[in-house]
Amino acid sequence: MVKIKYPIIAVLIVAIGLLAKAFLFPSEDKKVKRQFALLSEWVSKDPGESTFTLAHNVKSIGALFAENCDLKTPVHSLSGSYTREEITGIALQGRTQFLSLSLKFYDLQISFPEKGVANVTLTGKLTGKSTFGEYVDETRELECLLKKSEKKWLFSQFEVVEVLRK
């Protein structure tokens, strides 16, 4: 009985330690995924959202971005480099044009080409209903670049990948 008791206790201690490490010290991969989850949460909008919630979410969106973020898109008038403040303003303007809005990210493929840099290829889906009653349902493939700054992963580039159609 005593011979079995100590190995069981040792296994339990190791298991608890591994679980604690997984929850208290997430991998870089999980930290990057968390940034996309936060962006999705804060861009999304429910009908009847309060002004306080709108202001909080818009401010929070800005905190996810680096001081400058590049956007590359087939619509050349949208392409360019934007400051964090400009992104916050665009987010405010965009969210007020919708009664409901949902942003989801799928199929995240994350690579770390160098320390402090993450490349992510993913599918983004934006759905919603505008204040004019029009429905939006857009799906795009994106390539994103995140850079680590002061232990936080910040978005520094988004590129919309053009998909060839028949």
Regions found by a protein language model. Give the residues of each.
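Hydrophobic membrane-insertion alpha-helices, especially the h-region
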Residues: 6-22
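Transmembrane signal-anchor/signal-peptide helices with a preference for the extracytoplasmic
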Residues: 18-34
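Surface-exposed, charged secondary-structure patches
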Residues: 26, 86-132
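Stable alpha-helical elements in mature extracytoplasmic
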Residues: 28, 35, 57, 83, ...
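Short extracytoplasmic/periplasmic juxtamembrane "stem" segments immediately C-terminal to an N-terminal membrane anchor
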Residues: 34-49, 86
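Short, solvent-exposed secondary-structure junction/capping segments
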Residues: 40, 58-77
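Sec/Tat-exported extracytoplasmic proteins
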Residues: 40-47, 65-69, 91-98
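Short beta-strand edge/turn micro-motifs at domain boundaries
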Residues: 117-121, 133-166
